[in-house]
C-alpha cells in the first residue's frame, strides 16, 4: 500500500471501509508527517492533535458499529486560517487577529464535522487572503514542497503545500482572485473554485465579499467531488448562498467527455508566459482532444481589463470589510492616549504592508470625487467581462486555459514589486469577476516544477468541470507525482 500520508481521499476511504487501516492510524500518520515536514514547509499556524485523535477514535467506533457517516468519516482535513473554527485560533494570517478564537464554526466546518471529517489544524495564508505567494503572512513563510526555496503560491499557499507535502489528504482554501487555483497549480495538486454562491461564506473572514469563495484542494478530481458534495449547498445564514439544488458530483465522473465543446481563449496565453508553461498547457489541451472533446478557438475580449478592474473592486470591498478591525473587542490592541490614537496605532501595527496598501487603494477608489471615475467604472467593466463569458458559453461547454503564466518563483523575488505579484494572477482574476467555477489539475512540469491546467465552466456547472478533469486524470499520471521531500 502507498504510504498512509500519501493516500488520496478516495484511497483512504476505500482502505478504511475495507478495514485495512483505522482512522486513528491514518490521523497518526498525518500528524507524524506534519511533525517531520513542518520545519521545512511551515504550512500550519495551529495544530489540534488531541481533538483530531478524539475525532478519529469516534470515527473508528462508528465504523465498527456500522454507523459510518459517509466518505469523509475519519479522513484528516486541514483548514485555511480565514475560516472560523469554534474555539480554535483563527488569525487570517494577521497580527491584528492574534489570539482570536471564534465562538462558532463556519458553515463549511459544521458540514465537515457532521460528515465525520477529522480536523487537524489551521493553515497559513497571505494576510486576510491578500497575496499570491503566502509571503504576506504575519507569522511565517510557507515553502513549496517541490522546491523549498520557492513560494507555494497564494493566498491559500498553506492549503496547497500541506497536500503536496503529504501532511493531509485534503484541505479547504478560499479563492478571491485565484487563491485556490494558482497555489494548486504551483504545488502540483488539484483545486476547485466553485461558482460564487455554491458554497456558503458564513464564517469566512471577508476580503472581497462579491468575489470570495471557499473550495476544496486535494490530489485528485475524484477527491474534490467528494469534498464538494459535503460543503456545497444553500445556507440561509449567507445571503449570497444560491437556493438551488446540489447534485451528487461523484456521479459526474463517468470518464466520457466525447462531443464536449471546449473553448481555448486566446487572451489567456499572455505575453511573457514561460515557454514550458505554455507547452505543458497546450499538450494537456490536446489530451482533451484525444479523449473526444471538440476544441474551439474563442475570444474573451475584455480580459485585458480584468487586472485593473479587480484591483479597484477587491480593495474597495476590503476597505469596507476590514474597517471592523480596531482592537476594541478582540485581537491585537496597541496603546494610545486617545481612542482615535489607539485605533490608528492598532491598525497601523496590526495590519501588514500589503493589507494597508489595499485598504488605502480601496478607500481612495470609494472616496468622494473618485467613486464615479474608478469604482463605478470598474463595476461597468466587470459587467462586460461577465458578458464575455455569457456569450462564449453559448458556443462551448467549458474553457481550457493556463492557470499561472509562470511556475513557482523564488521566495523574495516579487514581494517588493506589487505589480509583478499582481500579474501572477492574470489568468485567474477574470473568473472571480464573472463568478463562474474553475478547476485546476496538474498537467506537467517545467524545469522540474509543476504546471496546472485550468478548466472554466458555466455558472453552477461544476459537474462538467469535474467530469472533464477526472477524464483527464484517468489518462494521465501527473496527479500521482509526489515531491521528494528530504525530512
UniProtKB/Swiss-Prot annotation:
| Ranges that cross the membrane | none
**Top-level class of the enzyme under EC nomenclature:** ligase
What is the purpose of this protein? Allows the formation of correctly charged Gln-tRNA(Gln) through the transamidation of misacylated Glu-tRNA(Gln) in organisms which lack glutaminyl-tRNA synthetase. The reaction takes place in the presence of glutamine and ATP through an activated gamma-phospho-Glu-tRNA(Gln).
Gene Ontology, cellular component aspect: glutamyl-tRNA(Gln) amidotransferase complex
Under the subunit heading, UniProt states: Heterotrimer of A, B and C subunits.
Highest taxon of the lineage: Bacteria
State which gene encodes it: gatA
> What SUPFAM superfamilies has UniProt attached to this entry?
Amidase signature (AS) enzymes (SSF75304)
**Keyword Nucleotide-binding assigned:** yes
Please report the name of this protein according to its UniProt entry: Glutamyl-tRNA(Gln) amidotransferase subunit A
Family, according to the entry, reads as follows: Belongs to the amidase family. GatA subfamily.
Amino acid at each position: 500500500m502507498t504510504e498512509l500520508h500519501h493516500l488520496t481521499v478516495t484511497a483512504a476511504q476505500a482502505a478504511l471501509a475495507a478495514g485495512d487501516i483505522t482512522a486513528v492510524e491514518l490521523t497518526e500518520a498525518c500528524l507524524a508527517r506534519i511533525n517531520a515536514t513542518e520545519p521545512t514547509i511551515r504550512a500550519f499556524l495551529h495544530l489540534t492533535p488531541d481533538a483530531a485523535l478524539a475525532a478519529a477514535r469516534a470515527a473508528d467506533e462508528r465504523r465498527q458499529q456500522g454507523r459510518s457517516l459517509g466518505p469523509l468519516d475519519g479522513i484528516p482535513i486541514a483548514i485555511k486560517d480565514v475560516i472560523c473554527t469554534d474555539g480554535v485560533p483563527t488569525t487570517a494570517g494577521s497580527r491584528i487577529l492574534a489570539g482570536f478564537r471564534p465562538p462558532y464554526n463556519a458553515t463549511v466546518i459544521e458540514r465537515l464535522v457532521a460528515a465525520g471529517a477529522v480536523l487537524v489544524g489551521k493553515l497559513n495564508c497571505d494576510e486576510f487572503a491578500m497575496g499570491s505567494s503566502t509571503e504576506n503572512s504575519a507569522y511565517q513563510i510557507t515553502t513549496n514542497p517541490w522546491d523549498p526555496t520557492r513560494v507555494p503560491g497564494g493566498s491559500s499557499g498553506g492549503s496547497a503545500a500541506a497536500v503536496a507535502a503529504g501532511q493531509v489528504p485534503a484541505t479547504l482554501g478560499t479563492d478571491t482572485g485565484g487563491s485556490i487555483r494558482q497555489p494548486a497549480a504551483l504545488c502540483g495538486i488539484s483545486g476547485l473554485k466553485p461558482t460564487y454562491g455554491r458554497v456558503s461564506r458564513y464564517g469566512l473572514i471577508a476580503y472581497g465579499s462579491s468575489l470570495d469563495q471557499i473550495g476544496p484542494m486535494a490530489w485528485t478530481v475524484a477527491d474534490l467531488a467528494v469534498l464538494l458534495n459535503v460543503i456545497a449547498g444553500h445556507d440561509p445564514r449567507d445571503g449570497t448562498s444560491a437556493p438551488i439544488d446540489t447534485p451528487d458530483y461523484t456521479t459526474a465522473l463517468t470518464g466520457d467527455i466525447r462531443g464536449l465543446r471546449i473553448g481555448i481563449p486566446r487572451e489567456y496565453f499572455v505575453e511573457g508566459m514561460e515557454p514550458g508553461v505554455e507547452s505543458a498547457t497546450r499538450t494537456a489541451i490536446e489530451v482533451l482532444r484525444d479523449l473526444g472533446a471538440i476544441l474551439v478557438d474563442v475570444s474573451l475580449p475584455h480580459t485585458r481589463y480584468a487586472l485593473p478592474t479587480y484591483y479597484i473592486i477587491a480593495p474597495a470591498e476590503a476597505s469596507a470589510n476590514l474597517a471592523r478591525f480596531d482592537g476594541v473587542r478582540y485581537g491585537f490592541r496597541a496603546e494610545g492616549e486617545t481612542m482615535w490614537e489607539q485605533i490608528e496605532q492598532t491598525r497601523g501595527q496590526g495590519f501588514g504592508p500589503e493589507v494597508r496598501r489595499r485598504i488605502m487603494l480601496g478607500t481612495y477608489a470609494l472616496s468622494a470625487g473618485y467613486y464615479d471615475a474608478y469604482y463605478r467604472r470598474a463595476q461597468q467593466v466587470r459587467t462586460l467581462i461577465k458578458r464575455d463569458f455569457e456569450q462564449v458559453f453559448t458556443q462551448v461547454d467549458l474553457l481550457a486555459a493556463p492557470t499561472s503564466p509562470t511556475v513557482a518563483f523564488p521566495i523574495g523575488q516579487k514581494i517588493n514589486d506589487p505589480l509583478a505579484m499582481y500579474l501572477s494572477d492574470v489568468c485567474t482574476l477574470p473568473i472571480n469577476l464573472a463568478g463562474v467555477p474553475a478547476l485546476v489539475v496538474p498537467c506537467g512540469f517545467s524545469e522540474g516544477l509543476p504546471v496546472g491546467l485550468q478548466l472554466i465552466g458555466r455558472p453552477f456547472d461544476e459537474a462538467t468541470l469535474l467530469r472533464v478533469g477526472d477524464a483527464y486524470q484517468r489518462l494521465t499520471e501527473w496527479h500521482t507525482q509526489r515531491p521528494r521531500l528530504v525530512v
